[in-house]
């Protein structure tokens, strides 16, 4: 299977940008995860109505960029981790109680 985007390259570029901006200073993984949570809160604000706002996609991108930053900071091969997780999900048996 071919992937047109290298997630590790995106994570690297995000990490470089964070360093350049001075936003990558001795954060613990927990502190970094809490920034993901804050981005999730911002995304939730964009879907409070019946239809998501135009800014919803920006907030989703912010979540992904935060995750890329965490991956880069912690030496995680995020692309392989995502592929491994997707493959593991394929092994799950469907649960009729979950599908509504």
Predicted regions, residues:
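Flexible "arm" and connector segments at domain edges
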Residues: 1-60, 64-100
